[in-house]
């Protein structure tokens, strides 16, 4: 089966295990490192003529905490999470900002983008035209 998607759509983390490194160490007084190394987890696929990106964003309010933008063939999802957990007579805040950018496939229609949020999963759907990519041959001039 042939695909029209670019080979590499978005950069991968150089150190995907970095966040697991901190999880391996016990927390002192219930504290974790003050910086968040987690990435926004994404899945993408072509589905019925549309490019779909699904982002795992539990615990956010999509109306207030999520911003989706498109520019020059790049789709960017920004989210911010702030939550407070109470347990064993203590409370702990969990917060962080997340940003991911993916390149849209050839033929993506930046004017036909839809987004939904359900049970912690943000789905962004972009229409993609079925047209075949065109080739252009370049004439070479001799300078001799």
Curated annotation (Swiss-Prot):
Family per record: Belongs to the small heat shock protein (HSP20) family.
Keyword Isomerase: no
InterPro entries from the UniProt entry: A-crystallin/Hsp20_dom, HSP20-like_chaperone, Small_HSP
KO phenotype (gene knockout): Strains deleted for this gene show hypervirulence upon intravenous inoculation in BALB/c mice.
Example of a GO cellular component annotation carried by this entry: peptidoglycan-based cell wall
Protein name: Alpha-crystallin
Main function: Acts as a chaperone, as it has a significant ability to suppress the thermal denaturation of alcohol dehydrogenase. Cells overexpressing this gene grow more slowly than wild-type cells, and are less susceptible to autolysis following saturation of the culture in vitro, suggesting this protein may slow down the growth rate of M.tuberculosis in culture and by extension during macrophage infection.
GO terms, molecular function: protein folding chaperone; unfolded protein binding
Gene coding for it: hspX
Sites of the Isoglutamyl lysine isopeptide (Lys-Gln) (interchain with Q-Cter in protein Pup) crosslink: 64, 85, 114, 132
Applications (biotechnology): In plasmid DNA-vaccinated mice, subsequent challenge with this protein induces positive levels of antigen-specific IFN-gamma and IL-2, indicating this might be a good vaccine candidate.
CDD domains: ACD_sHsps-like (cd06464)
